[in-house]
């Protein structure tokens, strides 16, 4: 794997173990990113998380949160516990990807633990519409996780080296914890030291999976107050723009009730092309989205069982596969055997 680089963001991660922290001094040390422990399992809330968040933000530091995973507890319940606590302490304006800290098995096999991690990560994404990162250490990745987790970015821990060793799950990292014995002004005792790439930063995923676009128009499609040709125009959709059909109103045959940029109204069905939406079929946990339409192609995303996605086209190069868009805006190919059109 690649090593440390002076162009990377400098960071620390902290918890209640560090007590009260002077984040002004931390910033003056050149630290740019602070990851804060929020929760553990479904039973522990870090009592310093709120003050750490508010004080770090007040100094203009980039803030992220992590959850320490307990494999003997329900994964989805842990995800909800994590996000509920962030909401409880008012931590809604964080800057970095939400982190899953996995470093204990509690008797779980690599397959079982990886499945639980995926359940946690996808539940966090579902609740927050924000992106995630996996924190672990090199030997743990090699011995206790499998390559299904490789679709998520990595924050790797390995001490006393300039570059982390290769592992069987990931080929690159966006975070590297290189020491647990850092000495930073403003922090009592030792703290973990990290370098982060820009990819650790996250913005709200505002992608919306639309189910329709315009057709047979060259300029604008009028949005009307009611499904009548002489009804008041309340908005316009530029040709080629996507929007959401909400439903067909039995009071206005030949019209769709739609939503476009916070405008809800009616458009004539003559000028609407509906996309083919779909969901999973005969899938127990999740459906792999692959880079190409082959079973040995790289997995680039996953779709939870029952999740809705859009079929973009059938690619003649990959018979038996659909090119799709997930609800998070990820593109790739899924096997047609596991797809139900809706």
From Swiss-Prot:
UniProtKB keywords: Antimicrobial, Bacteriolytic enzyme, Glycosidase, Hydrolase, Repeat
Q: Which CDD domains match?
A: GH25_Lyc-like
Q: Can you tell which superkingdom this protein's organism belongs to?
A: Bacteria
The record's top EC class is hydrolase
The EC number(s) this enzyme carries: 3.2.1.17
Q: Which SMART domains match?
A: Glyco_25, SH3b
Q: Which residue ranges does the record assign to the SH3b domain?
A: 212-276, 278-342
Q: What is this protein called?
A: Probable autolytic lysozyme
Which species is this UniProt entry from?
Clostridium perfringens (strain 13 / Type A)
